[in-house]
Amino acid sequence: MIALFVLMGLMAAASASSCCSSEDRANVMHNWDAAWSAAYSDRRVALAQAVFASLFSRDAAAQGLFSGVSADNPDSADFRAHCVRVVNGLDVAINMLNDPAVLNEQLAHLSAQHQARAGVAAAHFDVMAEAFAEVMPQVSSCFSSDSWNRCFARIANGISAGL
């Protein structure tokens, strides 16, 4: 009987460590607001470009997935605008974390968009997670990496479903 309780406790701990809890959501929204709020609109392009620079440094082949938006010229208006569009998509998802039904619909929509793009794989979202995990502590004080990782995984797993 004790073994059963130990097993249940371990399962609960494992589940909690991968769940984007209400506390995690609050931390992520606070961290995100510190980086992406309207008060910081002048640095949005730089933040988005930094994420993509980190992505491409981790997976150079991923740059080819963005050839249609001039990824070979990261300072082009076309690519900078795309970077901001991607991060704005994350902004929308983060702001839906407290409304799971709406978030699920949004993630399904984004998933369909990514499924339609040749070459995009679920593994790319792991690399994108690493890129954000590198950049976010630089732009958000008191950054909570554990909360960020759990909630980003919730979003990324929803978008990469079906890839």
UniProtKB/Swiss-Prot annotation:
Signal peptide as annotated in the record: 1-16
Q: List the disulfide bonds.
A: 20-151
User: Which Gene Ontology CC terms are recorded?
Assistant: extracellular region; hemoglobin complex
Does this UniProt record's set of keywords contain Hydrolase?
no
Q: Boundaries of each Globin domain copy? A: 19-163
Q: Any idea where this protein resides?
A: Secreted
Annotated heme b binding lies at 114
MF GO annotations? heme binding; iron ion binding; oxygen binding; oxygen carrier activity
* PANTHER family per the UniProt record, alphabetical: GLOBIN-LIKE PROTEIN
Q: Which family does it belong to?
A: Belongs to the globin family.
On assembly, the entry states: The 400 kDa hemoglobin consists of a spherical 24-mer arranged as a double layer of dome-shaped dodecamers. Each dodecamer is composed of the 3-fold trimer of the tetramer A1-A2-B1-B2 having one intra-tetramer (A1-B2) disulfide bond and one inter-tetramer (B1-B2) disulfide bond per tetramer.
Role according to the record: The extracellular giant hemoglobin is able to bind and transport oxygen and hydrosulfide simultaneously and reversibly at two different sites.
**Name the UniProt record assigns to this protein:** Extracellular giant hemoglobin major globin subunit B2
Which lineage do the record's taxonomy fields give for this organism? Eukaryota, Metazoa, Spiralia, Lophotrochozoa, Annelida
